[in-house]
């Protein structure tokens, strides 16, 4: 393989470079002129670019563009595309490359025993300065396609690394990220589906009206979450104002019952009362209230008649309550209720005893 060798003297290399530049200019001049020699009336004839075979790319490192003035070629690529003669390994050889603009570049290519690497030294620093290469840029090496003479032609190209800030600005700019919330009139008809789950508004306090509304009102539920909007069914409408009634403190939950005393059992904690017995019993008028008592009421072991007062928790859990009603005047006939009331009011001899027997 012919690698365009040149003498190592500076004068001869400069002369060859000038000759290559003149040859390039002559080719451009001949291509710009037409068959008649008048290029004013005829369009410019463009020579198609030569066919090239890509060899390898090299991402330049800070040391490649630093003060060392050398470019390290990977060993596998150097031995494959730029083999060196062992007899001339010490001085190296000169390689000619043509860039995209048609300018010829000549680099000294050699092998360093100290670092055991293949490097390009002479002429590389001028290439870096002219192309303004920086760490991260890519240098591409190519060669011609065709016969042996075409394959001996070497080409060099370069491209700068992309500016990541501009790339990110271009990518994210297409999405139109902004923090301006849309107006209600413009986006009032646009809705987005919410996930399939039942959301319960979050309150600092519980209100029995709001609590029941949040569970049983299926037409419209207030949803408090990230952003602004109202929940109607399972659709979340954007642009709607937030209902601030859901985030303010509401009245606490109050149940109308007897206050709970520690160590005591209240009627609220007892089982529900069963319906009254249907058997006909004895009628008794007490404090102006008609009361009916079964015939075997006193003989029942358990009774669900619970007074509104407080009952000992220990006694109520192990035994039933027994209510004994006794009067000094037993009116078995129960003929006149009004007479009993008058007699009770005048004499005051009637008595009521409540015995809670364990």
Curated annotation (Swiss-Prot):
Regulates lateral organ growth. Functionally redundant with NGA1, NGA2 and NGA4. Its main location: nucleus. Residues 25-45 have a biased composition (Low complexity). One of its GO terms (biological process) is regulation of DNA-templated transcription. This is B3 domain-containing transcription factor NGA3. Gene3D superfamilies: DNA-binding pseudobarrel domain. Residues 56-162 bind DNA. It comes from the Eukaryota. Keywords: DNA-binding, Nucleus, Transcription, Transcription regulation. Residues 1-14 have a biased composition (Polar residues). It is found in: Nucleus. Residues 1-45, 310-358 are annotated as: Disordered. It comes from Arabidopsis thaliana. SUPFAM superfamilies: DNA-binding pseudobarrel domain (SSF101936). GO terms for molecular function: DNA binding; DNA-binding transcription factor activity. Residues 329-342 have a biased composition (Acidic residues). InterPro entries: B3_DNA-bd, DNA-bd_pseudobarrel_sf, LEC2-like. It holds the Pfam family B3. GO terms for cellular component: nucleus.
